[in-house]
Amino acid sequence: MFAYPGDLSLKTGGYGYDRQVLDGLRKLGWQITLLPLGEGFPFPTADTRRGAETALSSIPDGTLVLIDGLAFGVLDAWAGAHAERLQIIALVHHPLALETGLSDEQQQHFRQSEQRALAAARHVIVTSPMTARELASNYGVASSRITVALPGIDKSDVRRVVNAAPQILSVGTLTRRKGHDVLLRALKSVEDLDWQAVIIGSKSLDPSTSEALARQVETLGLEARVQLLGEVDDPQVHFASADIFALASRYEGYGMVFAEALSHGLPIVACHAGAVPDVVPSDAGILVPVDDAPAFGEALRRLLQSPREREMRSAAALQAGSLLPTWADTAAIISNTLDGIS
């Protein structure tokens, strides 16, 4: 059984990971029942929390239950009460307390609740070595209880479009953690150069941030050069037509879009944030400090002014992308882990 919060069809990295893993496990012969837990996690209403706990409590004894960490981290009381009768596996994309924009009180609450929840899990699956280290060091999870299952990529032929002006692509939900505000300030600093930029990502998860970004584009006078597209049906088209990938995330548990950019041979500008340095090789991308718009702008300027450097970093990106796992590899790792527990 797979229990998840929210809308599994949302075009985010976390939900995309979930969908790919479910598809891969089914291809390997697993029979999976889906159990939706409701909206609003990790800040569920009291009614939503009760509904989720009631649904989970009705699961028969001995069932193997994989639960997405976005909900599991705040279901610590339920997890502790049912740890003995169920085989609970947590799927942690990144610790809840490391989300951007939380108050100190919220961070402490999430850290404590997630630590209690993880203590009740038979095993924990994470999407990056960095998250594994974080849980082992700061959440009391023994390394022997953690399996790393890196996100996969869909290997495909790289199709590149020749652009009159360099095309800068950014992909990430319009939330504060993704740092699009930093990217926009950086783009303003290179407006003397020739470029166009496209930002793809859901506008519905954090409407206030989405609206603020739209206002920022207008305030900076970038309406003619920056498109905020929202969700798109086929982001591959945009990866194929881009020259540079840029995302100023303040934290990433892995950063699936960076892996996607590598597989398309795109030079990358990003931040030293979370697992990003583990994903983006130094010869493929330029990493700058978090929230440093001037440094981000200078990195963009380097790539925009030097086609030769873009070519060199593109070749390095393609090489790194060729070594990344496929989704079949990811599913196989998780399948083997579940086999060892069930």
Range-by-range predicted roles:
Residues M130, A149-G152:
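Carbohydrate-associated surface elements
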